[in-house]
């Protein structure tokens, strides 16, 4: 079982450099999971690519959103409610001075005894410090 955070999933979805390394993490046999905040965070990345960076058009943005939702609806990646991990996430956030958004993925990985897949260096460092196996995809 693995937990994919928003940074790694966004890399895959918008095809940032190194996105291919995320593909094996979406194989149903490794039981990929994430917390529901991933949907909001990745939707925001899509918006930024369109609105702020002007790298995609509205039609492309909506297609990326639909691709993400298809992966979730087809249960390629299991999405769990954030509230399930919120207390532990808050503890991690306070202990490491990071956002609760980021710490939710750490709390989920820890609770599930799962490997965390991330493209966030700070997330990687905290995971290692907490004892969570981590795959860093820069």
Over which residues does each language-model region extend?
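Phosphate- and divalent-cation-binding pockets in alpha/beta enzyme and binding domains
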Residues: 21, 41, 88, 125-126
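Active-site neighborhoods of divalent-metal-dependent phosphate/nucleic-acid chemistry enzymes
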Residues: 74-115, 119
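Alpha-helix capping/helix-boundary segments
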Residues: 8-9, 38-39, 85, 105, ...
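Residues that scaffold the ATP/ADP-binding catalytic core of kinase and kinase-like folds
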Residues: 11-13, 45, 126
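Active-site-proximal, substrate-binding regions of enzyme catalytic domains
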Residues: 43-82, 86-88
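Short, well-structured N-terminal submotif of metal-dependent ribonuclease cores
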Residues: 1-37, 52-62
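Acidic, PIN/NYN-like endoribonuclease modules and their adjacent C-terminal/linker elements
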Residues: 1, 35, 79, 106-138
């Amino acid at each position: 079982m693995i937990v994919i955070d928003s940074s790694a999933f966004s890399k895959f979805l918008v095809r940032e450099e190194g996105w291919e390394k995320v593909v094996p993490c979406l194989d149903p046999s490794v039981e990929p999971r994430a917390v529901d905040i991933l949907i909001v965070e990745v939707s925001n990345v899509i918006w930024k690519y369109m609105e702020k960076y002007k790298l995609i058009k509205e039609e492309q943005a909506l297609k990326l959103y639909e691709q993400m939702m298809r992966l979730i609806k087809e249960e390629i990646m299991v999405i769990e409610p954030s509230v399930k991990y919120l207390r532990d996430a808050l503890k991690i956030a306070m202990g490491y001075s990071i956002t609760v958004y980021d710490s939710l993925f750490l709390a989920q990985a820890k609770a599930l005894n799962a490997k965390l897949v991330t493209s966030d260096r700070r997330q990687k460092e905290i995971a290692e410090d907490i004892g969570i196996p981590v795959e860093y995809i820069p």
